[in-house]
A protein has these predicted regions:
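Kelch-like beta-propeller repeat domains
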Residues: 1-221
Length: 221
């Protein structure tokens, strides 16, 4: 399941359970209400995609249909007055991937670092405007596949954690990567969010207890 936020509403798309690969869209608002409007349903079921909002449109990138990883970029215009639009394939991403990250800063979209074929980590790219042209960003040889990342506005950096439990910083001003802390455990999935300058990391695993930690970039120099 992937998620994105637009005008105080969270959009949750696709996902998988034991039997079904989902195509539905669930919407959560600040009144603590859930809805599932059918007009937002995806053209086909997918899981492991990433979603984001860019210029009043909702996007879904990549994911898997259960047989193959995808590279489609789907767009739904959220600015429609009546709320009824459609999903359109607007571009192809440079890699077929599942997982990975998408981060929007200003007019640019940064995406990639998901899991490609045979579990190999995909690259990292940036784009803008129509999202049809993606420019590659060099990445460290040792970085693994990434499932979550955050933007630190004060440092103008992305912080992300790979599937080895390694935290990485990518500074947008200098274009430099810095290897940060290595967590003392590996988990199947990581989720990150940032609040008041502190990064919170939830590690999830099928066989071990979940881990929840606080990470302050200022400490990690």
């Amino acid at each position: 399941m992937s998620a994105a936020v637009y005008k105080n509403q969270a959009y949750l798309l696709g996902g998988i359970d034991k039997q079904t690969i989902g195509a539905n869209c669930q919407i959560y608002n600040l009144d603590n209400n859930w809805s599932e409007p059918t007009q937002y349903s995806l053209p086909g079921g997918r899981f492991g995609a990433v979603s984001f909002v860019y210029r009043d449109s909702l996007y879904v990138l990549g994911g898997s249909d259960g047989s193959n990883n995808m590279n489609e970029i789907l767009r739904y215009d959220l600015s429609s007055q009546d709320g009824y639009g459609s999903w359109d394939v607007i571009a192809e991403f440079p890699a077929h991937q599942r997982g990975g990250i998408v981060l929007v800063v200003g007019n640019k979209v940064y995406a990639g670092l998901g899991e490609g074929g045979n579990g190999i980590r995909s690259g990292f790219w940036e784009s803008s405007d129509s999202l049809k042209i993606w420019n590659p960003i060099s990445i460290p040889d040792k970085i693994g596949s990434v499932s979550s990342g955050v933007y630190d506005e004060q440092r103008n950096s992305f912080f992300m954690i790979d599937n080895n439990g390694k935290i990485w910083e990518y500074n947008l001003s200098s274009g430099e990567w810095t290897a940060r802390s290595l967590l003392g455990y590996r988990m199947n999935n990581y989720h990150m969010f940032m609040l008041n300058g502190i990064i919170y990391i939830l590690g999830q695993d099928l066989y071990y207890a979940n881990k929840f930690i606080m990470y302050n970039p200022i400490w990690d120099n």
